[in-house]
């Protein structure tokens, strides 16, 4: 509800005061500088932190939850393209490819441990409108399997 009201307010400010805007939605952003170990950490940051500490990766049951993971460099590119076009529109920035949490955890090639499901856990998160591809020429160029493979090769201290 709050997000909807904020969007409504932004659009009204545009009408009332000529405010220029672009509304961008990000999907599970990962990459350099991400949060690794607080309540605000996303799944890739959590997995990286656990991997570096040689701990089992924790997966919220059932593990089949699907997400679209987007690298920060692709997000920055999408933001720039939206700013450059200046269409006063909404864009969803992602890869259009989903992976289950268990698939991502297995990419780290380490031990996995399941933890109980949480109330309110989303089962699926995906882009439902690809207007960023159509209107901005946006296309994600970094995929999560390659990112994780590079992360492991840089940080595998066996």
Question: Which positions does each model-derived feature cover?
Answer:
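Conserved beta-loop-beta element that borders a ligand/cofactor-binding pocket
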Residues: 7-32, 58, 112
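Alpha-helical substrate-binding/gating segment
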Residues: 26-29, 45-58, 66-91
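Mid/C-terminal beta-alpha module of Rossmann-like enzyme folds, strongest
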Residues: 78-120, 129
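Short, solvent-exposed loop/turn segments at secondary-structure boundaries
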Residues: 34-39
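Conserved C-terminal active-site "lid" loop/helix of NAD(P)H-dependent oxidoreductases
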Residues: 72, 100-103, 118-150
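Glycine-rich Rossmann NAD(P)(H)-binding loop
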Residues: 29-33, 59-69, 91-99, 117-122, ...
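Hydrophobic "lid"/C-terminal helical patch
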Residues: 48, 79-83, 105-108, 144, ...
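Active-site helix of classical SDR
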Residues: 2-5
């Amino acid at each position: 509800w709050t997000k909807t009201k904020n969007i409504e307010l932004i659009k009204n400010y545009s009408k009332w005061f000529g405010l220029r805007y672009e509304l961008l939605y990000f999907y599970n952003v990962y990459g350099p500088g991400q949060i690794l170990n607080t309540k605000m950490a996303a799944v890739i940051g959590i997995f990286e932190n656990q991997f570096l500490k040689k701990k089992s990766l924790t997966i919220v049951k059932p593990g089949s939850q699907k997400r679209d993971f987007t690298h920060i460099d692709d997000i920055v590119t999408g933001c720039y393209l939206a700013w450059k076009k200046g269409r006063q529109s909404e864009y969803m920035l992602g890869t259009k490819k989903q992976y289950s949490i268990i698939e991502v955890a297995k990419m780290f090639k380490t031990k996995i441990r399941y933890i109980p499901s949480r109330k309110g856990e989303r089962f699926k998160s995906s882009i439902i409108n690809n207007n960023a591809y159509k209107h901005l020429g946006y296309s994600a160029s970094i995929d999560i399997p390659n990112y994780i493979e590079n992360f492991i090769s840089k940080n595998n201290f066996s």
